[in-house]
């Protein structure tokens, strides 16, 4: 069991007794965005995006650092200019790790070494959703973007939802589903970016992104509405 705290620490706990097995600590900048990224476990390793713009790979059994690489290094005169938090969900396909930051950076690094493979100047505080061919994200202005995961080149762009505070898009039967601040759930075609449908499922923003289980989508609105539904064109 792995737990991450707001003070830059990551704990590995024994699954049978809950006792601490290892501890990793990182330096937290004086000013950071609220929230932390969720550690991503894959192939015996734990990948974590940190508040200082680093990505670290840990051995999940003992917490030993396999590599640590600074991938988001904003420069500026003020602490706000230098914000480099990696707070969103990451993705892994084969030997590539995909990371996005509110500092307008999305990038790919090699899982074996931490080597930077490419960088794109569009980022998201909520992170990325990854398919075999593309990366999808809703940036800080709620512009939805498709990015080629092999080289970082930009695909389609949707600007219809600007300033609607979109959640991270999630896959649903070949489409993308995401929510907004007004309680709406939106569906778009993942390949073309065509807007397919929308439906109001609450009166406020949602807690996190939609959760997909099989052919059912679950959303939980801050007005207390929990919804399970299916979608078909």
Model-derived features with residue positions:
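Blade-level signature of beta-propeller repeat domains, shared across WD40, Kelch, NHL, RCC1
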Residues: 201-233
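Extracytoplasmic beta-rich repeat domains
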Residues: 19-43, 68-92, 116-131, 155-173, ...
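Short loop/turn segments that connect beta-strands within beta-propeller blades
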Residues: 14-18, 60-63, 110-113, 148-151, ...
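Structural signature of WD-repeat beta-propellers
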Residues: 5-6, 50-51, 94, 101-102, ...
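Loop/turn-rich, solvent-exposed surfaces of beta-rich toroidal or solenoidal domains
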Residues: 134-146, 153-187
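WD40 beta-propeller blade core
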Residues: 11, 56, 107-108, 145, ...
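A generic tandem-repeat structural signature
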Residues: 1-25, 36
